[in-house]
């Protein structure tokens, strides 16, 4: 606790702070209140950004026992060397949306949740930094411990299909519509919009960046999406971690047999 207090005292302050407000408010009133609350809160030390480094991590596959837990948890992750202004980023974002980001309409959800009934919830995400070449592909699922092997096999199969066979033209066109609508809905939320505008202040961007990105999405071809997925999402490099009461699941299986 003393270390945390010292860190706060040595580094915290509003000298480099940014404030973004969205909604119905009085600008003069907010400006006066901001000065009243933060003008004297000076940062003890100058701000220095810590650069994030990409690391190609050797894949691991491990299971951890969590006794007496009814549900098991599956996590998969892959580090990707890419930034969000890379020409391939839009293709990867749309590819992930079709793979696991589009919830019930995604391939992972269709296969693992709806078709095979192996998971209560499954999905994936793809993110990339705006400053450094540090991106990541991430997937997760909640499931019954006895379904561990089947779920992992289905996950690997869908990753393999996405990176070798790719997506169809019909899938890509449908995904464009859904993905763009989700971004529009997100911007309609004041909290999301304020957060985006605040980060853009730091990045020296405007909403024009979003407009250009969404234009890229509209113009993507299946070939571009499939090429990007094959280039960046390497199945053999994905780390998989599972946690659950697998011992009890094995005992139940023995009893049934």
Kindly label every feature range from the protein language model.
Residues 221-257:
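In a subset of proteins, long, contiguous C-terminal domains/tails are tracked
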Residues 18-83, 187, 242-257:
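An aromatic/glycine/proline-enriched structural segment found at the starts
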Residues 34-35, 95, 154-159:
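Short amphipathic C-terminal alpha-helix that caps PH/PH-like domains
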Residues 76, 87-100, 108:
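Active/ligand-binding-proximal structured segments within catalytic/core domains
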Residues 16-22, 71-83, 109-219, 235-244:
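M16 family metallopeptidases and their MPP-like homologs
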Residues 8:
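Conserved, carboxylate-rich catalytic/transport cores that coordinate ions
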């Amino acid at each position: 606790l003393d270390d945390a207090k010292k860190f706060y005292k040595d580094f915290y302050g509003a000298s480099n702070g940014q404030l973004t407000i969205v909604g119905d408010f009085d600008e003069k009133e907010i400006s006066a209140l901001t000065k009243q609350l933060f003008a004297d809160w000076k940062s003890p030390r100058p701000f220095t950004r810590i650069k994030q480094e990409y690391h190609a991590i050797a894949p691991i596959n491990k299971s951890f026992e969590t006794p007496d837990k009814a549900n098991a948890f599956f996590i998969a992750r892959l580090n990707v060397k890419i930034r969000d202004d890379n020409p391939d980023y839009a293709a990867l974002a749309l590819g992930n949306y079709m793979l696991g980001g589009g919830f019930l309409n995604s391939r992972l959800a269709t296969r693992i949740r709806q078709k095979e009934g192996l998971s209560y919830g499954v999905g994936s995400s793809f993110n990339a930094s705006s400053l450094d070449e540090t991106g990541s592909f991430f997937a997760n699922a909640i499931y019954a411990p006895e379904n561990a092997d089947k779920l992992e096999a289905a996950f690997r199969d869908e990753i393999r299909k996405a990176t070798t066979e790719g997506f169809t033209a019909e899938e890509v066109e449908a995904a464009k519509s859904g993905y763009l609508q989700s971004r529009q809905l997100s911007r309609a939320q004041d909290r999301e919009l304020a957060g985006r505008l605040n980060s853009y202040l730091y990045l020296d961007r405007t909403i024009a960046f979003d407009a250009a990105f969404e234009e890229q999405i509209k113009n993507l071809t299946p070939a571009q999406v499939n090429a990007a997925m094959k280039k960046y999402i390497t199945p053999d490099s994905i780390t998989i971690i599972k946690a659950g009461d697998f011992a009890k699941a094995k005992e139940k299986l023995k009893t049934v047999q």
